[in-house]
Amino acid sequence: MPLTFGEYVLFKGRGLYTISEGKIVNSFRGCLDDLEKLTYSTYLCELIDISMVDDESNAVLFKELVTSLYLLNSNALDNEILMRAFEIKLLKATGYALDLENCCKCKRRLSYCDYISLAYSGGVCNRCEKSYGIPISSSTYNILRYLNFYSLDNIYKLKINDNIKKELYSIMKSLIGSIYQRRPKSLDMLDIIKESGDKNE
């Protein structure tokens, strides 16, 4: 079953693993019964797929994924905020942590930032050249810093307006595409869901 979190005993054959024992911990029914949640959860799993190689293990990233699925399943916070937070945790867990406290080029402390470098994965100060990146509002930059600093289960109180959500989506989509060189297919469905929601407002 898709999205089934469990404890398994695996036996490795010549090329594939076979499950010899298993215990289901959570099947995340709330995600499976809702198209939007199912699409978001599929996106989370796709991010894992594009950011890791076969047989690679990453306990930190696994914990972030399971936490995100629990939060998504329980309606604990805004789905879009959760996706952006997980994307940031993904970058950090795979060695591409965003540098949002210091200029990613000259390393000067940032008191203000209006540009994110895709090449260096971080904020750029006003003294350094701004190229191959994305302009960003100060409000969105502060939200990025917040999501980068706090754990997933501590962001449920965060409220973000639609303009900042769109800016965050654009920035993280560009960063992930630039770093991992692959685009999750579920993004197409997410774009359709977002467009449908915008038309209904």
What feature does the model see in each segment?
Residues 1-201:
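Non-catalytic alpha-helical scaffolds and adjoining flexible linkers that form interface surfaces
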